[in-house]
Each structure stands twice: as structure tokens, then as C-alpha cells.
């Protein structure tokens, strides 16, 4: 039975893809059959033949060393570095939930662990045309629990607590927090983490420092965060 989890963050550019790559790498190095998935990806470069390179997917693939084909990692790839709802409108290929779900289910039939990354923060709109799809709709459709990625630095208390409270109010399960850009011994960052734990009731699962090549979490603890795919 395949298991999966969703990776969301407190916002854009807080290191979701970097941390996701380390998560998938940890699973793969344990011998687990691991896959990566993302519904929509913006801000991608083009190959010489004009096709788009799914940058986040390529990063995770290179970081983790998984053999999963790149073309199975993301059904919607956009060139414009905008929120997916706007990039898709400009480029004429709006996200459709059945397509996202089909790609996910195919991976569930082939891999033991699926790590699905979101776009931006939890309020990121995925499609805002005839269909209105928020990131939370994707999470609910696939019935996934989440890990919350946050920066350890100044301002994170507000971002973490607001994100956690929003998700709790919408019955979205959060298994815990991974803090990125953490500097061991930094008094402010240590206090930020302590306050986030106190104000959200969520555990800190790992701390990632700049340049880390491994995720410092017990592999069994990591695997147990994943829930069975329905």
C-alpha cells in the first residue's frame, strides 16, 4: 500500500523544494521506493527545443537520486514566474483536478512513498477560471496530511502560527514543522522555534541548516509521518 504526505510552507522561497529533496533523498537511501509529485510548477526555463524544464522536480530528482521519470513528477509546468492560477491563464493551460488526481494515483500504483509538494503557501490559488481551485482543495481531494516548512529566522512566529491556524480551521492535518535556514546556537532562532511549538502545539520534526545535504530525522519517524493513500 502506497503512503503519501503533502509539503506546504509559510510562503514562497522558504525552502520547500530544498527540504523536499532532502526528505525524498532520506527515503531513497533507506531503500524505500520513493516518488515526488507537484500539481503545478511556475517560473520554469525552456530547453533548446522549446519544451519547459520542471525546475523543482529536476532539483528533487538530482538531490535525491531517484529514478522516477521527470515527466511523471508534475502535470502542469509554466514559464511565467507567477502564482499558478495566473501563469496558467496567461499560458492557456488551466489546472484540472482530475488530471492532478490521475497523475497522483498512477504514482501510488508504482511507489511506496509519495512526497507531494505544494506551490507557495497554503493560500496559493491553483486555478481561478471557470474552476476555482485552491491548494487546500488539492490536499483535501487527495486526503493528505501535511508537513509545514518554515524559515527559522525573524518573522517566522507570525507566519507559522497564521498558517497553522488557517489549516486547523479547515480540518487540514499538520504532522509537524521542519525549520529551514537554521543556525545552531542562534538565540533568536531557538526562541522562534520554541514559541512556534508553544503557540501551535505542533512538534519540530527537523532543523535544516544552510548547505545541509541530509535531513536529520530518524528514518522510521519520517516514514511514520506518511499516511496510506485512499
Task: Name these PLM-found stretches.
Residues 38, 147-150, 175-181:
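Short internal beta-strands
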Residues 4, 18-94, 98, 105-106:
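N-terminal phosphate/diphosphate-binding loop that engages ATP/GTP or pyrophosphate donors
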Residues 14-15:
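Conserved glycine(s) of the Walker
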Residues 128-136, 161-164, 189-194:
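Charged helix-capping and loop-helix junction motifs
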Residues 128-152:
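Inter-motif core of Ras-like GTPase G domains
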Residues 165-230:
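C-terminal lobe/tail of nucleotide-utilizing enzymes
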